[in-house]
Each structure stands twice: as C-alpha cells, then as structure tokens.
Amino acid sequence: NYVGEDLPALLKYKGKTNEMFTDTMLTMALAASAFMPVHDSQLVVCDPMAGRGTTLMLALRRGYHGVGLEIGKADVKEAADYMTRYLEFHRIKYKRTDSALTVRGQVGGRENKFVFSDSAEHFKAGDTRTLRLICGDTREAAALLKPNSVHLMVTDAPYGVQKGTAGRQDSIGGTIAAALPGWHSVLKPGGVPVSYTHQTLP
C-alpha cells in the first residue's frame, strides 16, 4: 500500500459504502480499462459523486491519484479536514492549497488540493500523489475538470444524488443523464466508468 490501510477506514459517517465493495468496483474498473499496464503513479481515479471520499481514499491507498466532485459543502469540508488530520498524525509530508474554480466566467466550485508522498525523499524528488476535492455540481464536470484527464470513474450513485442540487431532490436517472456527457469528456480513451445503485433507473 502507498499509505496505511486505515486511510479509508477511519472516517465513519452515515451512508458510507462498504470499503471492500468499493475496492472491488475499483478493481473491476481497472480490469475493464485499457490501463492495466499503466504504473500506479500515473492513474487518476475520479468519483463524480464523491460524498466524503471513500472511493478516493481507497485509490490513494493503492498509490493512484484521486479527484472527487461533490455538491455538499459539509461533505467536502469533512473529507478535506480528515485528510489533513490523517497526514499530520502520520507525519506524512504534504502541501494543501484551497482555491476557487471558474465555470463560464463565474465561481462554479472550490477545490481543496493535497499533494503528498510516502516519504520525505520522494516528496523532495517530486514523486508525489494528488488528491483533489472539488465542491461543485457533477453536471459541470466538463468545466471543472480537464478533458481526457481521468483513467477510471467509480461512484456510488445514491449517496451523491440524494444531496440534490440547489436545494432540490433530483432523480438518479435525471442527474446521471445530465452528467454523462461531461463525465465522458473527462475520461481518457480506454477509460471506464463504474457506478453502483441499489435503486432502479428509469
């Protein structure tokens, strides 16, 4: 493991997807993609409905990079604060930056970005991993993320969708249908999306 087994396990919250199941989804996505031979340090995993980041923490544990989109400000803050506490407790060298993101000329989201490494020597040499926690609408993925920047996309849809957008509850099918073009644009050719829902799509 690139970081400790406890990274995805310590953060507890209502609605958290089972870690073993989420890890299986990551394995499925990688196996179905064109990136099995790609070195871990180059793989970018995106959770477009990230919640508090279980999928991203599992990706980091493997040595991948992680980027998450989440509409809930409280969830993004909790994930960012947790990551800060974890890195500091384990004395892992890191740099955190917080910034606003622009969508069509207006502030469309905020990003908490962590750059860290498994050793001080690797950090100094630039051999690092990145976690990006973006508070923004997943339907704006094409504006919030660069085209062809993600190798794998893994999410547990109900947790993200139940947050709604702008104070309203959106259907799972409606939200995903609206988000799909943007998701497709940020996936690299050969990339794979894997989404789980216990509900039935229309």
Show where each model-derived region lies:
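Class I S-adenosyl-L-methionine-dependent methyltransferase catalytic core
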Residues: 1-202
